């Protein structure tokens, strides 16, 4: 394992590297969270779609596999969000990752319990509101990210420096990041850490069908399409199903996406041509399926290598 880094995010989350796993419904559960944390990153259990009993089970699984810190993502708009938070508090989770709504209504309970909280945003307005609510950091998601994204259309390269200049709290970059160069670029823009999602899907341990992983690594950066921009935009790989939905108006596309249900279950029962496969534009940079620890160590090693190369250029050397 690479030598641990130390900055505001690693200290806040208690991890070795400032790399957190993007929460993915029914995919990043207890086992995946533990694997990421054991590899030096910060694993996150996605509570979306889990009952109280399910979440308790996944927390126990994670704790049986790692002694390292991990967090739980709670989409605020979900009807059982308060219940999920209650489980996290009762079971001693130290970091809650809120998204899809304002965290303000939960902040009193979170702070009383002594939890740390990070919140996902995709715009300046959302970030300022999250900071005012009292979150400890924000995950800023650029438009090139996979899965459900913001409607603002602002890319990571533009969103991150704008938020860094405007906020007092740390910013974690999300969207278009999957290697050491992306990690270093995010840090150069002022982020204190990164979130990875699509790159995590393309790991040996990720519990999605192999055709999903193969489709990602065989794709170019322009192989994705954004569906349902009105209410719940989602970036996915192009195939027969997405081509049909892309021809609908936004409202109809939103209904069609909702009717598909969870992406993992669709993939389990479908094929590369018929499954809805959330995927970011970073797919064009992912060369193959690797273990999680190799992905993370490669990002850290790669970032250091790029930094050394840039150092020689800045100091007057040749690239």
What is the role of each PLM region?
Residues 24, 176-177:
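Active-site metal-binding loops of divalent metal-dependent hydrolases
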């Amino acid at each position: 394992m690479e030598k641990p880094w130390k900055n505001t995010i690693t200290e806040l989350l208690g991890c070795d590297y400032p790399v957190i796993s993007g929460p993915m419904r029914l995919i990043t559960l207890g086992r995946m969270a533990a694997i990421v944390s054991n590899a030096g990153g910060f694993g996150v259990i996605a509570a979306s779609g889990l009952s109280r009993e399910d979440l308790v089970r996944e927390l126990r699984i994670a704790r049986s596999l790692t002694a390292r810190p991990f967090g739980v993502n709670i989409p605020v708009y979900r009807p059982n969000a308060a219940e999920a938070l209650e489980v996290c508090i009762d079971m001693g989770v130290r970091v809650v990752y809120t998204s899809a709504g304002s965290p303000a209504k939960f902040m009193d309970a979170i702070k009383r319990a002594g939890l740390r909280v990070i919140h996902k945003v995709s715009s300046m307005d959302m970030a300022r509101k999250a900071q005012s609510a009292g979150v400890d950091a924000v995950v800023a998601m650029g438009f090139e990210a996979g899965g459900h994204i913001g409607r603002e259309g602002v890319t990571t390269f533009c969103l991150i420096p704008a938020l860094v200049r405007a906020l007092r709290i740390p910013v974690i970059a999300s969207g278009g990041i999957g290697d050491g160069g992306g990690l270093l670029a995010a840090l150069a823009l002022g982020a204190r850490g990164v979130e990875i999602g699509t790159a995590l899907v393309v790991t040996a341990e990720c519990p999605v069908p192999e055709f999903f992983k193969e489709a990602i690594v065989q794709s170019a950066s322009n192989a994705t399409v954004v569906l349902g921009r009105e209410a719940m935009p989602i970036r996915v790989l192009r195939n027969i199903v997405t081509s049909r939905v892309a021809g609908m108006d936004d409202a109809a596309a939103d209904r069609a996406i909702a009717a598909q249900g969870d992406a993992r279950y669709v993939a389990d029962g479908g094929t590369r041509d018929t499954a809805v496969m959330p995927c970011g534009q970073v797919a064009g940079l992912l060369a193959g399926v690797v273990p999680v620890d190799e992905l993370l160590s490669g990002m850290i090693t790669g970032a250091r290598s790029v930094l050394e190369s840039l150092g020689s250029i800045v100091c007057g050397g040749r690239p």
